[in-house]
Amino acid sequence: MKNLFILFLAMIFASILFIGCSTEDNPLAPTDPGNGGGDPDPIVIKTPRFMHIESISVTGFPQNKPNGDTWDWNPLSSEERKPDIEVVLQRSGNHLPVFWSDRRKNANHTSTYVFTKPASSDDGKLPYDVPYSQTWMISLVDDDFGGKDQMGSVSVKPSSIYVKDNATNFNKTLTSGSLKIKVKGAWIY
């Protein structure tokens, strides 16, 4: 009899628990999706205002010019005839550069070169804030005795690089043929 009474009380308790649950929204949480809770701080995906470029790295470039010639044509400037590389950051179109880097002499096409300093105080500086909705170019240039040779360029479009994850930093490698340029920095919201 005692066991029957305990079983009866357990059934009444279970019934009260099930009756207390409902499918109605919780009136204390009007944003409740109907599951009895609610996210007090829903995640909002932000759109950055700027791509804050802190450094530009060259991790690979063509060993020779498209016609097969070496980059340095003057054998007196370098026995190995390797390029003296610089990077240029500018808005796409016919815009003046906002950053022109210092030079790396006799660069090896498989080595990594990090650029953060300008060639002179008149050549801009990094970090630089690229507006989110604009397209920019980073060009690699060979500074020769006979002039500057364009070695290639990559397009930098922040809206194509951002992955809508509210990230703080970015580290993205952009490629064009055998040219590989890495941009590193932070998103500004």
Task: Describe these PLM feature segments.
Residues 46, 80, 129-133, 174-176:
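Surface-exposed coil/turn segments at beta-strand junctions on protein surfaces, enriched
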Residues 68-78, 141-168, 181, 187:
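C2 and C2-like phospholipid-binding beta-sandwich domains
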Residues 15-52:
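Bacterial Sec-dependent N-terminal signal peptides
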Residues 58-108:
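Calcium-regulated, polybasic anionic-phospholipid
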Residues 87, 114-155:
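Eukaryotic beta-sheet cores, primarily in C2 and C2-like/PH beta-sandwich modules
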Residues 3, 21-30, 92-98, 127-135, ...:
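Eukaryotic cytosolic "membrane-facing" regulatory regions
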Residues 1-20:
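Sec-dependent bacterial lipoprotein signal peptides
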Residues 102, 124-128, 170-171:
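Beta-strand-rich interaction surfaces with strong enrichment in secreted/lumenal proteins
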